[in-house]
Amino acid sequence: MGGCVGKGRRHIEEDKLDFKGGNVHVITSKEDWDRKIEEANKDGKIVVANFSASWCGPCRVIAPIYAEMSKTYPQLMFLTIDVDDLMDFSSSWDIRATPTFFFIKNEKQVDKLVGANKPELEKKVQALADGS
């Protein structure tokens, strides 16, 4: 499964991606991001950041899988950022397609995955969890 490219159309609030049942922190501001990154550093956690969009089909497919991973790997911190809600912030990460996953340790990117590739996401998350 691939990713969505380009700036999408906005949907109403109820169209937000569903991460229920997981331990995914929804980032709604740069301040939220800074707080969570600081918390992860303090706790020695690796961050998995999912840049996604509510209108993106592959993002909708991977959302419940991402939520499940957040429960399976509590030693990691799972964040999600809606690229339409935080356009400037997302642009600073050079997001070209959604979903894009960044893996961050000690405030530095250690890996990246573009697209809703479940096996590859699971492999990367597992490797980071094993090494944390």
Swiss-Prot record:
CDD domains with a match to the protein in the record: TRX_family (cd02947)
Active site positions: 56 (nucleophile), 59 (nucleophile)
Annotated GO CC locations: cytoplasm
Subcellular location: Cytoplasm
Transmembrane intervals: none
Annotated Pfam families: Thioredoxin
Domain Thioredoxin: 18-130
SUPFAM superfamilies linked: Thioredoxin-like
Family matches, as InterPro entries: Thioredoxin-like_sf, Thioredoxin_CS, Thioredoxin_domain, Thioredoxin_H-type-like
Keyword Cytoplasm: yes
PROSITE patterns xrefs: THIOREDOXIN_1, THIOREDOXIN_2
Site annotation Contributes to redox potential value: residues: 57-58
Domain of life: Eukaryota
KW Acyltransferase (keyword) present: no
Keywords of this entry: Cytoplasm, Disulfide bond, Electron transport, Redox-active center, Transport
Residue pairs linked by disulfide bridges in the UniProt entry: 56-59
Xref: PANTHER family: THIOREDOXIN, THIOREDOXIN H4-2
Function in brief: Probable thiol-disulfide oxidoreductase that may be involved in the redox regulation of a number of cytosolic enzymes.
Family affiliation: Belongs to the thioredoxin family. Plant H-type subfamily.
Protein name: Thioredoxin H4-2
Lineage: Eukaryota, Viridiplantae, Streptophyta, Embryophyta, Tracheophyta
